[in-house]
């Protein structure tokens, strides 16, 4: 068995702790499946809008301050615009769709699978740490997005599934991970048997190595979860 990448423990962003639990109590736990599909589709739309803004700024048609304000503090630092996160060569300038698919008998134990696929900015190394961190958000310093609460794909766990899967491409790197209640397992293996060599990796702030597969595909993200 080929060993995969290392895992990452679940966290709660301290700056947004109260807000997160208020939202979970009032909406997510009461209507988990409709809320999950709505949240994931909204995330996809937000990723597309972020891409459009990044293209405008990178191509000189707009300035960051046209769309973003700069604020600091634990709740806002991750939402400040960072031009180094984006690369025009990897952003899909043609496809702006958010695809929602439902496939029968394709999940673990032959359950059905819902997938939401966007062609936005992708999830790069610096955002991977926020994948399972409740309250983590990159949207609090702009009025151009729907979301800012820091729930994201994590809402899929409220439907009763054991995990959800994220496959994402960011600037030539394809990552894949299974996200559980208390951890995220990065599942691109350390060694690529087809290429006969190790897969490259990035290192997170806590030293976790996350392997990826190099790709020519444009930035995109697919979030999938089982439906019982």
How would you name each of these model-derived features?
Residues 130-145:
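Bergerat-fold ATP-binding/catalytic subdomain of histidine kinases
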Residues 102-104:
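Conserved catalytic core of two-component histidine kinases
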Residues 142-228:
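GHKL-type ATPase core
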Residues 44, 48-52, 135, 139, ...:
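A generic secondary-structure signal for well-formed alpha-helical elements
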Residues 118:
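Acidic ATP/Mg2+-coordinating residue in the GHKL
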Residues 1-99, 125-132:
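Bergerat-fold GHKL ATPase/HATPase_c domain
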Residues 121-122:
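Glycine-rich G1-box
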């Amino acid at each position: 068995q080929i060993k995969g990448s290392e895992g990452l423990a679940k966290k709660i962003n301290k700056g947004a702790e109260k807000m997160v639990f208020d939202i979970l109590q009032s909406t997510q736990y009461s209507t988990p499946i409709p809320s999950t599909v709505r949240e994931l589709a909204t995330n996809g739309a937000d990723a597309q809008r972020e891409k459009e803004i990044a293209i405008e700024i990178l191509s000189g048609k707009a300035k960051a301050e046209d769309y973003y304000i700069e604020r600091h503090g634990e709740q806002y630092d991750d939402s400040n615009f960072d031009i180094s996160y984006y690369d025009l060569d990897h952003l899909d300038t043609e496809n702006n769709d958010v695809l929602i698919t439902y496939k029968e008998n394709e999940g673990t134990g032959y359950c059905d699978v819902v997938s939401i696929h966007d062609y936005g900015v992708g999830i790069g190394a610096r955002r991977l740490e926020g994948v399972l961190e409740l309250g983590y958000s990159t949207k609090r310093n702009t009025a151009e997005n729907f979301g800012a609460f820091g729930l994201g794909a994590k809402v899929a766990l409220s439907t009763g599934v054991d995990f959800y899967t994220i496959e994402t491409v960011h600037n030539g790197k394809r990552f894949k991970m299974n996200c559980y209640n208390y951890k995220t397992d990065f599942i691109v293996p350390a060694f690529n048997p087809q290429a006969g060599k190790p897969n490259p990796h990035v290192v997170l702030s806590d030293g976790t190595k996350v392997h990826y597969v190099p790709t020519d595909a444009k930035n995109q993200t697919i979030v999938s979860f089982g439906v019982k």
